[in-house]
Design a protein with these regions (language model features):
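Short Gly/Pro-enriched turn/cap motifs at secondary-structure boundaries
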Residues: 48-51, 75-78, 90, 115-122
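Glycine-rich beta->alpha junctions and the first turn(s) of the following alpha-helix
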Residues: 108-176
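A short, Trp-centered hydrophobic/proline-enriched beta-strand micro-motif
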Residues: 36-44
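Short loop segments at secondary-structure junctions
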Residues: 20-22, 63-65, 90-94, 102-105, ...
Length: 176
């Protein structure tokens, strides 16, 4: 469970954020995320759509100096205690990445979602109801979300498989 929480923070948030953010965004968020003072997470999975990012229903609409996000992300590791979230939403139908801070008006997270295993990490829904985020929290370009996502998903998935092998290799059921 702890390995999953660490993986969600270090790879799905920090690594992904680093590669799609600009210098100003890194200066504001990276040091606290690297030190562990802030915990990060990635919001991609949606109720009813899972990881089908092309079917995603979360939207972001530009309104002056802000974007207004509406939608829900589910099964988000570190969603309960996270401070900042790399969230994917559609802008004019194109998948786009945003940084959402827990303090943004209109943002909330659900209670802890109970799980069968991996209890060392929390899981929650991220809820955006007319959530206002600064326009400077756009990560990369509008429509660049799929590129960021695909570039950064394989390393965590490989890491998760290695972590799980390490966990189960101690189980007598998998010994020769």
């Amino acid at each position: 469970g702890f390995a999953l929480a660490y993986l969600a923070h270090s790879m799905l948030f920090v690594n992904n954020f680093y590669h799609c953010s600009n210098a100003e965004q890194r200066a504001k968020y990276l040091a606290k995320s690297l030190s562990g003072e802030w915990i990060g997470a990635m919001g991609m999975t949606e109720p009813g759509y899972g990881t089908d990012v092309l079917g995603m229903t979360t939207t972001a609409v530009r309104d002056g100096d802000e974007y207004i996000l509406n939608g829900t992300k589910t099964y988000i590791t570190n969603g309960v205690e996270g401070h900042c979230f790399l969230v994917y939403a559609k802008v004019d139908g194109r998948v786009t990445a945003f940084l959402v801070d827990r303090t943004c008006p209109g943002f909330s997270s659900s209670h802890h979602i109970d799980k069968l295993g991996m209890r060392g990490s929390t899981m929650a829904e991220l809820i955006f109801e007319e959530c206002k985020i600064p326009k400077n929290n756009l990560l990369g370009e509008i429509g660049g979300g799929l590129t960021h996502m695909m570039r950064n998903l394989p390393p965590p998935l490989i890491g998760a498989r290695i972590d799980m092998y390490g966990v189960v290799s101690g189980d007598p059921a998998v010994k020769d």
